[in-house]
Amino acid sequence: MQNGTEDKSNIPARSNDDVLPPLAVRLTMKVMRLIFIGKMFAYSFVPFPPFKLLTFDNTVGWFVAYSAIVSIWGFAVWMERGYRHKINLLPPRCTKIRCSRCNTRIRSPNWFKYKNWLYFFLLYVSLTTSNLIIQLASFMTEMSRRGISVPGTKDPGKRDYLGLIIPMRFIGAFIHYMTANLFKEYYLHNGPLEKNDRPSTDEKTSENETL
């Protein structure tokens, strides 16, 4: 049994990095983060400016290339956000006591990376497909409004593709959300492997036994 005074010699001194920023700064950062996320999701619902510059001589290959470029841009933005989150944590650590991702990373780190990058690839293909369908549907809608015959339709003035565009925009926004969350989780669990990656039960019980 120890006396009323505790030995504080082993307690590390608080550094300047441990001090939380002022409340106004934290609120401002949260508002800016929400504005950024809202702006990113807005791109899923607002047509891109190049749509207005399209002519009726564009080929399907041009649409595919443009969709791939747009998807790369969206992917790069979320990748940069996830990497910035990783830099702020240094090194990234998961705070869950039981985490399947951490167990997979420790047991088979190569499979952890391959599995996540496979998810990234599938999300990228899904985002490119969503952008491509939106572009083609918007383009055909504009052709129908101008009275130009669309392949596979008999009445060009009565065909409207808005019923296809709106669901695809919601799907695109959901893909953006999945991509952002996957990058965050990947960087959070992809830290360097160490022996004491997680506290053992013996260490926890030894801490509880001290009175």
Curated annotation (Swiss-Prot):
For the Cytoplasmic compartment, the record's topological domain ranges are 1-33, 80-116, 184-211
- Pfam families for this protein: DUF4668
**Tagged with keyword Endoplasmic reticulum:** yes
Per the UniProt record, the lineage of the source organism begins with: Eukaryota, Fungi, Dikarya, Ascomycota, Saccharomycotina
> Where does this polypeptide localize?
Endoplasmic reticulum membrane
Protein's UniProt keywords contain Transmembrane: yes
Q: How does it sit in the membrane?
A: Multi-pass membrane protein
> A GO CC term?
cell periphery
Q: What is its main location?
A: endoplasmic reticulum
Name the record gives this protein = Uncharacterized membrane protein YPR071W
> Which InterPro entries did the record assign?
DUF4668
Keyword set, alphabetical order: Endoplasmic reticulum, Membrane, Transmembrane, Transmembrane helix
Side of membrane Lumenal, spans: 55-58, 138-162
In its UniProt entry, the species of origin is given as: Saccharomyces cerevisiae (strain ATCC 204508 / S288c)
Which residue windows are transmembrane per the record? 34-54, 59-79, 117-137, 163-183
